[in-house]
Amino acid sequence: MEPSALTLTEAAEAYLDHLRDARGCSPHTVSAYSRDLGKLLAWTGSKGPARAADLDKKTLQLFLSGQARALAASSQSRLLACLKGFGRWLMERGLPRNPAQTIAFPRKETKLVSVAGEAFLSEVLDDPGTDEGFEAARTRFCVEMFYGSGLRLSELTGLKWNQIARDGAWARVLGKGSRFRTVPLTDAAKASLDEYRGLCAAKGVATSAGPVLVSARGKPVGNRIIQRTVTDRLHAMGRRGKSSPHVLRHSFATHLLDHGADLMAVKEMLGHASLSTTQKYTHVSMAKLKETYAKAHPRA
């Protein structure tokens, strides 16, 4: 159906269906774009066009100028990426031009990623804790995978038993853009996997297929539960800064680079589509280098 026959709301819903069904975008991406388009629809409800065919550059510029006051630069960039994709989709279906095509991205604020220290993480990983229950074993495995293999939260909660090698040496994970990659497991991760697998088997939970991360009753657990338990573990060990599975992933990448790992190899292990995404970790390593230089060099 041509854009001229669609209301803006109908077009937005059809675009989200396209992302979900034809493009195979992750639920996280579809949800984020749904929120972004929802902002546009709420704004146009009183100030903009009702028909998709009437969406133009001026309308989008006015909308974005209002959003700029409420959103961080990175959120503005994602919002504009959503609008560019939406405009391109409309153009492919008959709109004369992409109304968002020539709108420039805002400059992103340069922020260093949050990283936990190596000594602290060694303490976290070496301390078995006092809780020997099922959830504690699952949390230990999660921490090992986030820091030892650099997984994203959604990649670990989506991991299936049949994606892990029988000897536990590697796992094949499904990342962003529906791209698979193979990641190695550390010896400590393999040991924590064996412990957790044994507890699953003792509870009658299948460990040949199905999701790896489950509750004590064998039900799949989602991102929120794993986020909470890992964050609680880091706090219990004395972490005062930002604490999350993603901090462990940031630490994985930064510590690899600190110890001389090749940037391209780190990019592949993280599952980044672009090298520029991985390069943000070099800023952290450079910051550490400058700090070391300032403390150690007699002329600094």
Describe the role of every protein-language-model region.
Residues 1-300:
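Conserved catalytic core of the tyrosine transesterase superfamily
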